[in-house]
Amino acid sequence: MRWNRRRWLGALLLVGPVGSGAYWWSGSRSAAADAPIKLVVSLSARELRVIEHGSTVVTYDVAVGRPSHPTPTGTFTTGDIEWNPSWTPPPTNWAANKKYQPPGAAANPMQAVKIYFQAPYYFIHGTNNPDSIGEAASHGCIRMVPEQASALARRIERAGGHATLVISP
């Protein structure tokens, strides 16, 4: 096989430098229409349903944004799935005194996986605070039991790497 500079450059641009924490997201609503998996989040019920071929295959209890930091509503396409992510406090007032958490750290609020869904800082991810599940406790992200977040991410990857995400009040 011959080395193809253009392909390698494209791969590097898509993935980013190793360890950069960069992610790629198409943001394409047309991609959402083609996604074989649909995730439906009810903020009031605090649950995430996974729908495949028109049928609910699994329902997870989740934590959602608190009233002061609500989870955005609408239709989204999930983007990059990052395994074993680090956590860098976002440049927001609530995170001003928080510290960087490396991958695998017990205090890392992302835990084993994060699934991007809305710019700039909204994810579906595991949690280091499982008691928050079923509550309005996050700063807008959708928190899951870590093992369930990993199972969801694997399901999305098997289905092509993206899903339609519908979040309703």
Region locations from a protein language model:
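N-terminal export leaders
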Residues: 5-10
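Solvent-exposed coil/turn segments that connect beta secondary-structure elements
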Residues: 44-46, 53-56, 65-67, 81-84, ...
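Structured segments of extracytoplasmic/periplasmic soluble domains
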Residues: 51, 81-84, 152-159
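A structural motif detector for short, solvent-exposed N-terminal "entry" segments of globular domains
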Residues: 30-73
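Exported/periplasmic cell-wall-interacting domains
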Residues: 21, 28-36, 73, 92-169
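Secretory targeting signals
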Residues: 1-3
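Hydrophobic alpha-helical membrane-insertion segments, chiefly the h-region
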Residues: 15-25
